[in-house]
Amino acid sequence: MTGTPASRGSLTHEPDRFSDPAWELLLAGQDMARRWRHDQLDVEHLIQVLFSDSSFRRWVEPLPLRSDDLLDRLEDVLADQPPARGDQLFIGEDLEQLLETADQVRGRWGDRSIDVPQLIVAVGADPRIGAELFAAQGLAVDRLESLLRQPSVSPAPAPPPVPTAASAPAPTPRSAPAPRVMAPEPEPMVELEREPSALEAYGRDLTEEAEAGSLDPVIGRDSEIRNLIKVLSRRSKNNPVLIGEPGVGKTAIAELLAQRIVAGEVPDSLQGLRLIALDLGALIAGAKFRGQFEERLRSVLEEVSRSDSGVVLFIDELHTVVGSDRSSTDAGSLLKPALARGDLRCIGATTPEEYRRTVEKDPALNRRFQQVLIREPDLELSLEILRGLRERYELHHGVTITDEAIQTANRLADRYISDRCLPDKAIDLIDEAAAQLKIEVTSKPQVVEEAEADLRRVELALLAAEEAPEEERIQLQRQRLEVSSRLDDLRRRWQEERTQLEELGQLLQQDEDLRHAIAEAEREGALEEAARLQYDQLHTVQQRREALEASQAEAQSAGTALLREQVEAGDIADLVARWTGIPVQRLLAGERRKLLALESHLSERVIGQVEAVAAVAAAIRRARAGMKDPRRPVGSFLFLGPTGVGKTELAKALATSLFDEEEALVRLDMSEFMERNASARLIGAPPGYVGYEEGGQLTEAVRRRPYAVLLLDEVEKAHPDVFNLLLQVLDDGRLTDSQGLTVDFRHTVVVMTSNLASPVILEHARSGSSDDAQLQQQVDAALSSQFRPEFLNRIDEVIRFRPLKVKDLVRIVRLQLADLSTLMAEQGLSLEVDDAVADSLARQGHEPEYGARPLRRVLRRQLENPLATQLLEERFRSAHGIRVRCGTDDGASLEFEPLE
């Protein structure tokens, strides 16, 4: 059996030839064919609808047929048919013949249109399947026709007897049709469902959604919407394309245009327009054969051009349509003729990068569009947008969002989330914080769970005390009564607060519905109705809402509330901390105090470098106070000095002080980048080379953690090409990797260490000279011989580290001994060390040219190794501590005594 598309002469192209029930039967058969995933509508689909659909079963119930047996046989036939290979539905040849037979039956019966009984008779006459199914149950076509065509009797006082099939009269000539009654009488039919148009199937009517009030309010953006309206009002090139980074509000501007069209706040040339957003998911989904995607897009464009009411097509993510490459024909070739003829008015939206990649490479398509740049809003405008959206998110989540939370989200999103744009990233913060609070509100409060645990504990104790003294049991029973009473009170308060929150959510919804009804009444000119809604119902709702919010605020301030219904600044800070790994909670409240005490925090770990610590702290404070170029890193430092004097340790301490964890230190050993080709690893391998998709070691590390201390250790060993890359980082605070992605270094502290000029610094320290100017000249000469001037000029501070003295090493020894005491305390032993021990170890480890590293070896050799041996020998088994003192012979060796 083959299927062909319905021809021009097919009865399916003449719906007027059918009655409403008969046409609905054909439509239901079409749905049945799609349900079976068949690409051909045929007789068996109509039969299954007749016997399985309650809307049509009344037509066949009087017939002597067993529906279950017939449907079982029919499902076997339908299951054997192959599945569809495309989206088109064909009309089977057998169904075409059935419709012709039904038309002949209509002619014999003298009816004006084909009705369901004629279709059933034609099914019984179908030679392939219908006649077989009916004949298997003893129902021939002649009897079928006689059952369905029963004449009525002239009006009489009493109803006539129902004629049998044997007494049915012969067919009446067409010229004199006899009146008849079809059994059973169908119920009144509803209006037939029609197939959705291309715009309905593949688009969203934004103006309809704006009229229904389902679009979010759009605040500000006056200049952008004016530019958009000006381009749409032009005679030619009236197709704007909104170009902006992700999250700046391109789609929101299109929604704002729809809202202004509905409100009548557009020029006369745009009044009454429909703004349809193209649904790319529906347009592309299922287009698995060549040309299907373009065919769907062409049907949309044709319907837009035929529209009398005026349609503007909004194509969000324009590059996915133009650069879809779904087949050999680019969709841009379909847009260009329609745009050139003026049949299509289109608003596109895309990012600058995608616009360059897809649209600008086609000059013919590019000149059809007029660019409208959408820039990221500043903090002030972003704050206004967030405040305008507050009610929508409060309504959705059923919680209250404080203004402090909105300001915090706006500020922290701008400062700590650098890979996205405002207001989108701030909206995400508010949305997720509100969702998290909603989950907490709907969950059981912790105080209730603790009371339930206390009750279970007391009840278990009471069960275990069956043989205990009577006084103890009475005490436990009294405790159970107290805990149970407290738990009942907590549960009652919890339920009351939940009821209040639910009522508040309902009031928020009523407030939103009333505002929409007022706006609609004002648009329609029903000013009395609008006034009644505003000053009667809305006023009542707002009064009740204010009373509930005041009651909840009072309970919160008194500390008696079990549930928290307000999103606060701390919630936003917690969320930013989880997203970025930055301890924003501490920065939120105590950053000023921390910055003012930065020297003391750094000096606890970095010993003997007072000048270096002070210089770093001053530079960080200047940056945090806003006295630096906002495009540059927080600070850039070059640490110079001998090895082991604390250069790397200061970078670690800085990471801990600023970001509360040493993991915020991104460390790169620049000795790994001594060769020219190795420098490419910082930003990633070029296209075509191994490792291109992995990204660069420097750019990927900073992209994952933009708030960090970047330590470039032994920077003088790097290839000169590395410094060319660092120029952009130090000056512009950004670096573009091999994949074209820009990495932000504005929130990074760049620290470079070098051993350059170490001999000069050591010699100056040995000589005891106080001529610091001469030393500075020698250091500058050493730097100039290694680094180019443009690199040195971009560094904020070049900081010298002086060699360590014995008194500095004594302080370092005491820090190391404090760490060792902590380890010994875990074994239950205290550690007491004489002051002479620290002095002795410091003198033994003092080697100015090597810094503090020899001291680590002395500690290990003189203290840790012998102490470990004696611990394993269990010399201190009965002691509670160990005392360490210098030996009596030469003072260089140490002695260990147990403390009883």
From Swiss-Prot:
Residues 154-163 have a biased composition (Pro residues). Keywords: ATP-binding, Chaperone, Coiled coil, Cytoplasm, Nucleotide-binding, Repeat, Stress response. GO terms for molecular function: ATP binding; ATP hydrolysis activity. It is found in: Cytoplasm. Residues 427-557 form a coiled coil. Residues 91-154 are annotated as: Repeat 2. Residues 15-154 form the Clp R domain. Residues 151-183 are annotated as: Disordered. It comes from the Bacteria. Residues 591-803 are annotated as: NBD2. Its main location: cytoplasm. ATP 2 binds at residues 641-648. Part of a stress-induced multi-chaperone system, it is involved in the recovery of the cell from heat-induced damage, in cooperation with DnaK, DnaJ and GrpE. Acts before DnaK, in the processing of protein aggregates. Protein binding stimulates the ATPase activity; ATP hydrolysis unfolds the denatured protein aggregates, which probably helps expose new hydrophobic binding sites on the surface of ClpB-bound aggregates, contributing to the solubilization and refolding of denatured protein aggregates by DnaK. Homohexamer. The oligomerization is ATP-dependent. Belongs to the ClpA/ClpB family. This is Chaperone protein ClpB 2. It comes from Parasynechococcus marenigrum (strain WH8102). The gene is clpB2.
